[in-house]
C-alpha cells in the first residue's frame, strides 16, 4: 500500500457537514484495509483565488495509506460531492504523522486569540 496526502476544500455553507464527511471518508479507507495517519481540519481559510464566486472555504488535510481501488473510490466520492470544491491527492514516500506547517499556523492563531481574550477578561 502507498502513502498519500489528500487536501480537499469544502463550500463554506457546508462547513457543519465537514465532520460527517471526514468520518465517511475515514470509514471508506479503513473498511478497505487502509490506515489513517493524520487528519487535520484547518477550518475556514481565505482562498488564493475565487472559486465559484467564493473567497473563503473550509480546508481538510488527510494523510493515509491505502491501495489503488480505495483511492479511486475516494476520488470518485470527491468528484461527485457538490460540497467539495477542489481536491488534491499527492503520493508520499512515507507516512506523515506530525502536525503540518498549516496546522502549526492554525494553532498559533488560536493561541494569539486566546491570549488576546485573556487580558480583556481580566479588565472586565
From Swiss-Prot:
Keyword Ribosomal protein: yes
GO BP: any one term: translation
Keywords: Ribonucleoprotein, Ribosomal protein, RNA-binding, rRNA-binding
Keyword flag RNA-binding: yes
Family matches, as InterPro entries: Ribosomal_bS6, Ribosomal_bS6_sf, Ribosomal_S6_plastid/chlpt, Transl_elong_EF1B/ribsomal_bS6
Compositionally biased spans, kind Low complexity: 114-124
Region Disordered, residue ranges: 96-124
Molecular functions (GO terms): small ribosomal subunit rRNA binding; structural constituent of ribosome
Cellular compartments per GO CC: cytosolic small ribosomal subunit
Pfam family, one: Ribosomal_S6
SUPFAM superfamilies: Ribosomal protein S6
Function: Binds together with bS18 to 16S ribosomal RNA.
Record family assignment: Belongs to the bacterial ribosomal protein bS6 family.
Protein name as catalogued: Small ribosomal subunit protein bS6
Amino acid at each position: 500500500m502507498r502513502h498519500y496526502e489528500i487536501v480537499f476544500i469544502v463550500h463554506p455553507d457546508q462547513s457543519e457537514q465537514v465532520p460527517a464527511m471526514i468520518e465517511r471518508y475515514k470509514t471508506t479507507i479503513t473498511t478497505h484495509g487502509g490506515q489513517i495517519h493524520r487528519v487535520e481540519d484547518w477550518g475556514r481559510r481565505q482562498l488564493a483565488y475565487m472559486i465559484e464566486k467564493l473567497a473563503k472555504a473550509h480546508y481538510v488535510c488527510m494523510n493515509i495509506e491505502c491501495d489503488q481501488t480505495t483511492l479511486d473510490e475516494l476520488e470518485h466520492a470527491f468528484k461527485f460531492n457538490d460540497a467539495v470544491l477542489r481536491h488534491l491527492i499527492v503520493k508520499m514516500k512515507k507516512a506523515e504523522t506530525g502536525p503540518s506547517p498549516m496546522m502549526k499556523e492554525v494553532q498559533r492563531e488560536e493561541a494569539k486569540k486566546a491570549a488576546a481574550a485573556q487580558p480583556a477578561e481580566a479588565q472586565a
